[in-house]
Amino acid sequence: MDAAGASCSSSEAVARELLLAALQDLSQEQLKRFRHKLRDAPLDGRSIPWGRLEHSDAVDLTDKLIEFYAPEPAVDVTRKILKKADIRDVSLRLKEQQLQRLGSSSALLTVSEYKKKYREHVLRQHAKVKERNARSVKINKRFTKLLIAPGSGAGEDELLGTSGEPEPERARRSDTHTFNRLFRGNDDEGPRPLTVVLQGPAGIGKTMAAKKILYDWAGGKLYHSQVDFAFFMPCGELLERPGTRSLADLILEQCPDRTAPVRRILAQPHRLLFILDGADELPTLAAPEATPCRDPFEATSGLRVLSGLLSQELLPSARLLVTSRNATLGRLQGRLCSPQCAEVRGFSDKDKKKYFFKFFRDERKAERAYRFVKENETLYALCFVPFVCWIVCTVLLQQMELGRDLSRTSKTTTSVYLLFITSMLKSAGTNGPRVQGELRMLCRLAREGILKHQAQFSEKDLERLKLQGSQVQTMFLSKKELPGVLETVVTYQFIDQSFQEFLAALSYLLDAEGAPGNSAGSVQMLVNSDAGLRGHLALTTRFLFGLLSTERIRDIGNHFGCVVPGRVKQDTLRWVQGQSQPKVATVGAEKKDELKDEEAEEEEEEEEEEEEELNFGLELLYCLYETQEDDFVRQALSSLPEMVLERVRLTRMDLEVLSYCVQCCPDGQALRLVSCGLVAAKEKKKKKKSFMNRLKGSQSTGKQPPASLLRPLCEAMITQQCGLSILTLSHCKLPDAVCRDLSEALKVAPSLRELGLLQNRLTEAGLRLLSQGLAWPKCKVQTLRIQMPGLQEVIHYLVIVLQQSPVLTTLDLSGCQLPGTVVEPLCSALKHPKCGLKTLSLTSVELTENPLRELQAVKTLKPDLAIIHSKLGTHPQPLKG
């Protein structure tokens, strides 16, 4: 704590004594004039209400001034008001006594004056940012706009895409308008959130966006009328700094000098913005050391200060901008008070190109690199992540300078990161056993840090592993100097947290070389741990799978002189096969479609606890995708007969991963999507087409319909190696574009035998499209399960399927409402000579006397047709999903 904080009580007593003496020197007329001037001359936009001033004597005024402005600022205010009231002799005496007894540090600048000084300081300090290779670049020139999609902090249903989900808001490019909207909330007329969470995966650009927000605030572009002071707080650094500090100390460290009026700044918390970068690094609140701090002047650990801010027990009216990875958002939201969420989605296609031209200073090189990446569809897709885009640009620049073939650039994040390491080593002319040994130690440092939640490393850490001054240290670690209690503390961190996680995964394989007894032990400990796919080691585990591909293992052997035992890969495969059906498969399937009112609150709490489990299935698919080995994926999925994704707002990358796994799945595989968002958010197009282009467009008759978010999955289903046999879509919104793509897939999917459409939001046009696919001559779907309200409005499409489908043998309408207006055309279709249906399931369907009579007549006419209903003499079978 600073000296001012340490002597808080004594300085307050002195300030009170000075104020009381000055005010008691005033006559009744002077005191009255002082009160009026105090009312009419607000400081920093604030003044004491007249109702509290009107009848106050000297003692009352002293109390109110100290309460309203804080002790030392109150002396400054009093001195200036006395001068305005033309009581100059008392003002002069107060100034002299203030200088003698309190010093001049706080008496020179008002908060308004210091605000301008602080903004100028922030503009100077943050005008440049260091890239991962320690090169400094101007933030305005390097920052490339990101797509940011507003989310919701209230209903989980809105975030996760249940059957009642709203249309997702359009992702907007991160200009000042988008940043200004963050604290407005979804409803402009409702209460504005005090906490905004910028969420997104590793390397997506959350930190850069947060720094740009700070820089634009200092430049007067953001929150000008709402925020007087904004402070950037890297959570990882604060957690690892030794000693204790108060929030006031942390604020003072960011100010241009030690004369900052910290107490007056903190006296107006509603005018403050704290940017907490990397809040996912905080441990759980259950530990005693995480008890939130409530006093901004209490010297304590960084964890307690951050916990106090996040829980709003410390400065509850202050604004918070928090960055966090998606995987830990559920755990973080338990600490926050009504947060507004926004998702950082990386670069749009337009901004990918802008980034390339900003990175390459030579326009011809930029054009060549961008054209190459654009032609590599998978690599181009990966470049939506800014850190991956930076690595790709760095590697391509090195290969250009060395005259090498650009085609060696790879297609997964793992392969891109591995190529980055090897390219950096080659460009530096370093190789051989010494550098290989250094790299092993660097990987070990990364692994130690990941396991301990540590991102900052001391010089002693580097010396212990003989990395101090090494070549790999200068290439892959960035140096930081932090103010310490007695001296500057030097720390090191990896160029990006995701890169540290990649090196940690590589460490497991480098350590696997050796005695058979120790070979795969550490790898198995990683994948078997709860953190492996559900916790903070999820990305490390994903990288591990990517490194286990045959091609990557060969690269590791060539570049690092390491032979990875084959049993490591086989043991990992057996681990995947041992997962059987993840817990997520049964979480939603066993729930009733509609919860009772008294159970809703309890169910919501259970969903929060299960949130990380709900990601298990998708995370496992990401791991398999990262291998890019069809045979490995097929073997892994052979023991997982059903893939289930529940309550996931699927992104394009999620669909890319799912589609690859579906393409590789063995015969008999089932896929169930439950309450998944399948609506793509459209990017806003600002430029209008020219008149000629619009004229050409209107004359064109063969325009291709827009692709749906589900198209990659549909394209995977029609490949000959795809063994997907059962597809169930439950409680999903299915736009017409999705139905169109799914219909095309139904026509030719080689293995699909069963389709379930359960409680989805389908339009009449969508069902018409699906019926066309099901009635197609080459469609192989034999079982169709449908649950939907309002079947009477679309029964004619179902009739078409029954009359025209060459292979449909089972129709399950369990749980549907079947009035007479539906049963009559249904029975007519069943009697049709071309209808080959063998089983009609009507479990839990309420039927009146006339429909029952018509169905009985169908049974008499077609004795081979089994109609399952309790009143028709057949036993019901439960509906799956």
UniProtKB/Swiss-Prot annotation:
Tissue-level expression: Detected in several tissues. Expressed in renal epithelial cells in medullary thick ascending limb of Henle, as well as in salivary gland apical epithelium (at protein level). Isoform 1 is widely expressed. Isoform 2 is primarily expressed in kidney (at protein level).
Residues recorded as bearing Phosphoserine in the entry: 104
Gene Ontology process terms (BP): acute inflammatory response; acute inflammatory response to antigenic stimulus; antiviral innate immune response; defense response to Gram-positive bacterium; defense response to virus; host-mediated regulation of intestinal microbiota composition; necroptotic process; negative regulation of canonical NF-kappaB signal transduction
Binding site for ATP: 200-207
Alphabetical list of InterPro entries matching this protein: DAPIN, DEATH-like_dom_sf, LRR_dom_sf, NACHT_NTPase, NLRP_HD2, NLRP_innate_immun_reg, NOD1/2_WH, P-loop_NTPase
Residue ranges of domain NACHT in the record: 194-510
Domain of life: Eukaryota
Keywords per UniProt: ATP-binding, Cell membrane, Cytoplasm, Immunity, Inflammasome, Inflammatory response, Innate immunity, Leucine-rich repeat, Membrane, Nucleotide-binding, Nucleus, Phosphoprotein, Repeat, Ubl conjugation
SUPFAM superfamilies (alphabetical): DEATH domain, P-loop containing nucleoside triphosphate hydrolases, RNI-like
Biased composition (Acidic residues): 596-611
Residue spans of the LRR repeats: 459-484, 637-660, 749-772, 839-863
Its biological purpose: Acts as the sensor component of the NLRP6 inflammasome, which mediates inflammasome activation in response to various pathogen-associated signals, leading to maturation and secretion of IL1B and IL18. Inflammasomes are supramolecular complexes that assemble in the cytosol in response to pathogens and other damage-associated signals and play critical roles in innate immunity and inflammation.
Domain notes: The poly-Lys disordered region (350-354) mediates the formation of liquid-liquid phase separation (LLPS), an essential step for nucleation and formation of the NLRP6 inflammasome complex.
Family per similarity comment: Belongs to the NLRP family.
Protein name per UniProt: NACHT, LRR and PYD domains-containing protein 6
Native source organism of the sequence: Rattus norvegicus
